[in-house]
Amino acid sequence: MKFVVLTDTHFVARGRRIYGLDPAERLSAAVARINREHPDIAFVIVTGDLAHWGEEPAYDNLASVLAGLRAPTILMMGNHDKREAFAKFFPGVPRDASGFVQTVQVFEAATIVTLDTLNEAAPNHEGFLCEARLAFLEHALAEAPADRPLLLFQHHPPFDTGLRYMDTIRLANPDAEWEVIARTRKPDYLFMGHLHRPISGVWRGIPFHIQRGLAHQVAFDLVAEGHIPGSHEPPDYAHVSVEADRIVIHQCSFMYDGPLFSLHDSVALHRVSF
């Protein structure tokens, strides 16, 4: 099974820009590349912060761009989102009995669990898992088929990464999440967004991938405190392949427009410049 991961689209109303960028331009470029190069993917998942201010015109704009995707989409909530505004333009997206945007989808190759970490009451954008969401997670992990990998997706990381300000707005109750995992089942892979940086590693024995943002980025700065250092580093998406014996993640810089050449080309090898 193959799929694509995007995150932190931070959409705004048509005609608006944030930090000098138009998120719609970037997502349109990603959609075109995905349609052209990945016709065999099962879905595209967007792991939250769909809209920057959670306003209805932004979700309207997002829906228009995503309509161009040929693959199905799985959409998630991030700290910038508003569930009710989102639901007006994406009425077909499943919500659980408590109204949270989270699902379990069982594919032949893997089980996909999406977890809603949005806390709309938080003044500082940190995530939270209430009792209802922890119960959802416990049931999802306990009931997932044992004969295939389980991939867990959530917006907020449940751990620090060294990005000092971002560490103050991660998941607020990571121990509660871990307690559920410890008594049920460890996901085979954990996918997240929120940090606007490409980060990978292992959390308590679980390999993880944090996807770079589609819009503005968080600069690689492990010293800055009291604010979030931003940058215009180029965006990318992750192309994930799930096989019986491996999970492979490739990053695609879909807006790169520089030269392409063969490393076996002796002329290219000795060129001074392109």
From Swiss-Prot:
Matches recorded under Pfam families: Metallophos
Keywords noted in UniProt: Hydrolase, Iron, Metal-binding, Nucleotide-binding
Chain sites annotated for binding Fe cation 2: 49, 79, 155, 194
Residues at which Fe cation 1 binds: 8, 10, 49, 196
UniProt key word Nucleotide-binding: yes
EC number: 3.1.4.-
Protein family: Belongs to the cyclic nucleotide phosphodiesterase class-III family.
Protein name: Probable cyclic nucleotide phosphodiesterase RPA0124
Organism per entry: Rhodopseudomonas palustris (strain ATCC BAA-98 / CGA009)
Lineage of the species this protein comes from: Bacteria, Pseudomonadati, Pseudomonadota, Alphaproteobacteria, Hyphomicrobiales
